[in-house]
A protein has these predicted regions:
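C-terminal catalytic "cap/lid" subdomain
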Residues: 1-320
């Protein structure tokens, strides 16, 4: 088995937490204990690659930079992505190594600060189309003030009701390919557990001469994870989130869980609008892409059900 695991934001920071380093390390230890359970069941020629989100960490870092800009210059979003990749990669790497060592396993683990290619003419870069919320939720007055201070920002209402329903949104371009694919393939081939494409990867565009340049954007981590799955020739794509299964008719009286379905059914349900754009939508879309590429199985489930889901006992299981 060649397995690509995509960790959700709750694997590193819970919604109710402030996001201290201590809190995040605790969450990483919970997460990597489950990953160690997976590794301990793997055969010698099996491979594991891990990717992760960075939404809360990147949002907090952007707030810190905004508050401190009078003393030190704020950094661009590609730099913020690189910084949080290093932060989260370090925490996951250390925690996983510790659990594997306790089990007598000495599989090398490495975290890679990784670039992902996007198109400079992606529609997300133009007009008011930017769709990825970042930073804190704001009141309408706070949103107006932010727009006054930063006329170049796009600030949108992201929830239909409530007091704090406004957020800054940034471009979320479609990932095209993984810039560091050859290095990652070699490490995976050597039996190393690789943590890569964190937070969707650092968004870069090609300058046409073999050079790359970072851009102000945030790539969806599940879609970038699917591109990473292609790079490492994964046969199984496991997306871990905060629910055991995806749902049809979410939030309605006729809501129902999605168990084992085919690729054709997944495409049908997605086209019917069952999966929301800001949550389950990109996950299902990533699963569809993976199976269309040639993957064998895509799974969506919760962290605590990961091993059961890999054994086919729970989760939303999508096959071609």
């Amino acid at each position: 088995m060649r397995l690509l695991v995509a960790l959700g934001g709750n694997a590193i920071k819970q919604a109710h937490e402030k996001g201290t380093s201590e809190e995040q390390f605790v969450n990483c230890r919970v997460t990597t204990k489950h990953l160690a359970d997976i590794v301990s069941r793997m055969k010698e020629d099996d491979r594991l690659v891990i990717t992760h989100g960075n939404g809360p960490q990147a949002g907090n870092l952007m707030v810190q930079q905004d508050l401190g800009k009078s003393a030190v210059p704020a950094q661009s979003m590609d730099i913020v992505g690189a910084m949080t990749q290093g932060q989260i990669g370090y925490m996951l790497q250390q925690s996983l190594i510790n659990f594997l060592t306790d089990r007598g396993l000495h599989t090398p683990v490495v975290a890679v600060v990784n670039q992902v290619l996007v198109k400079e003419d992606d529609p997300e870069f133009f007009g008011e189309t930017a769709s990825k919320p970042v930073g804190n939720f704001l009141t309408e007055e706070e949103a107006k003030q932010l727009k006054l201070e930063h006329p170049e920002y796009i600030v949108k209402k992201v929830k239909p009701t409530g007091d704090r329903v406004w957020r800054r949104t940034v471009a979320s371009p479609d990932p095209i390919s993984n810039v560091d694919r050859e290095a990652i393939k070699r490490m995976v081939g050597a039996g190393i557990i690789v943590i890569a494409s964190g937070g969707g990867g650092i968004p870069v565009v090609s300058e046409g001469n073999g050079h790359y340049r970072g851009v102000e954007a945030v790539i969806d981590k599940d879609l970038a994870g699917e591109r990473l799955a292609e790079v490492v020739d994964a046969d199984t794509f496991l997306i871990l989130t905060d629910v055991e299964k995806a749902k049809l008719n979410f939030g309605k009286p006729n809501e129902e869980e999605v168990g084992k379905i085919t690729l054709a059914q997944a495409k049908k349900y997605s086209a019917e609008g069952h999966f929301l754009a800001g949550s389950m939508g990109p996950k299902v879309r990533a699963c569809i892409r993976f199976l269309e590429w040639g993957g064998k199985k895509a799974i969506i489930t919760s962290l605590d059900k990961a091993v059961e889901a890999l054994n086919g006992k729970t989760g939303t299981q999508i096959t071609a």
